[in-house]
Design a protein with these regions (language model features):
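Short cysteine-rich clusters marking metal-coordination/redox-active sites
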Residues: 38-42
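Short, flexible, mixed-charge glycine/proline-rich loop motifs
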Residues: 22-36
């Protein structure tokens, strides 16, 4: 797994590239991995690992729920980087 500097850079890239929202999630779930790719690092979050699933409501013409799977470490990097970006605004 990448070191903290690399993970934070990946989180910044995901945020600035609109791969994941900057706002607070509407729901956050934690538990065993769902064997889905992590939105931040693109590596699978296996069932033997813990993950956060972030859910964001989507309004508009096609309402729904966007889900993002993150390793715990990637979630921490996302949280730090998104709050840093908000502070700059």
């Amino acid at each position: 797994m990448p070191n903290e500097v690399e993970v934070r850079a990946q989180a910044r890239h995901a945020l600035t590239g609109d791969k994941i929202p900057r706002r607070d999630p509407d729901r956050t779930w934690g538990g065993p991995g769902a064997d889905m790719p992590c939105t931040i690092c693109a590596k699978r979050v296996t069932v033997s690992q813990m993950e956060y699933e972030l859910q964001f409501r989507q309004d508009g013409a096609t309402p729904g729920l966007d889900r993002y799977h993150l390793h715990l470490r990637c979630f921490a990097a996302w949280e730090m980087e998104r709050t840093k970006l908000e502070d700059r605004r």
